[in-house]
Regions:
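Acidic-glycine-rich active-site phosphate/pyrophosphate-binding loop
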Residues: 30, 114-121
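Short amphipathic alpha-helical segments with heptad-repeat character
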Residues: 12-15, 19, 91-94, 98, ...
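Hydrophobic alpha-helical core bundles mediating ligand binding, dimerization, or RNAP-core interactions
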Residues: 18, 22, 29, 97, ...
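Extreme N-terminal tail/first-helix region
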Residues: 1-16
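Short, contiguous alpha-helical
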Residues: 15-19, 26, 34-81, 122-185, ...
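Long, charge-rich low-complexity segments
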Residues: 99-116, 183-203
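Helix-adjacent hinge/juxtasegments
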Residues: 65, 70-107
């Protein structure tokens, strides 16, 4: 396998991961009402809205002029990403969330295999493009996990699972095996098959 093929595969998979985590977070925060979107479980915890705000702020800093400027922008106010103004609405948060993701995809989608070993800086430290992308995938997965956990906590028994339901692994494996045999699983997102199985069993 040549470097070009490997590089193209990496970028394709990275974009897929970004889209999958975006969709997972949205499936979680769509289930909570406005009160729970802005509610913290204790004084040290972030709310769902704060996680959204921080992720979007990070994206706007990291991915604006990705190849040509430091990923930690001088005009970024990181500490304010963890402060929620009283007048902030769900619509405000969703708009900012989408703005961050648009910035990310605008930066990553044009990349080619030839870009992957280029050097970019984050807080003055050198990263290859591969390292910078992997760093952000890990960071966003961390915060998406918090969003899912909080939404699940608030919804409790009314939570509609976004993965394989508890005590249904054997059934899910059979369901997935049948999808693989039929050739319909390959195009699904990383979390889509589990959600499809859960939805099928709610009917």
């Amino acid at each position: 396998m040549g470097d070009q093929v490997l590089g193209a595969h990496f970028l394709e998979d990275a974009l897929k991961l970004f889209r999958d985590y975006k969709k997972l977070a949205e499936g979680a925060f769509a289930q909570v009402d406005d009160h729970d979107l802005f509610r913290a479980i204790d004084d040290e915890s972030n709310t769902i809205a704060v996680n959204m705000k921080h992720m979007a702020g990070n994206m706007l800093s990291r991915w604006t002029d990705f190849l040509t400027s430091d990923g930690e922008k001088a005009n970024r106010e990181r500490d304010m990403e963890f402060v929620m103004l009283p007048e902030t609405t769900r619509a405000d948060m969703v708009e900012f969330w989408e703005r961050g993701w648009r910035c990310l995809f605008a930066a990553v989608e044009p990349l080619t295999a030839d870009d992957l070993m280029r050097i970019v800086k984050i807080r003055g430290q050198d990263h290859t493009v591969v390292q910078a992308i992997n760093r952000q995938i890990a960071h966003y997965a961390y915060h998406v996990g918090q969003i899912v956990y909080l939404a699940k906590h608030f919804k409790s028994s009314r939570w509609q699972t976004l993965s394989v339901p508890k005590n249904r692994s054997a059934e899910f494996n059979k369901f997935l095996e049948e999808k693989v045999k039929s050739g319909t699983s390959a195009a699904a997102g990383r979390f889509d098959v589990g959600q499809e199985f859960a939805a099928k069993n709610r009917k």
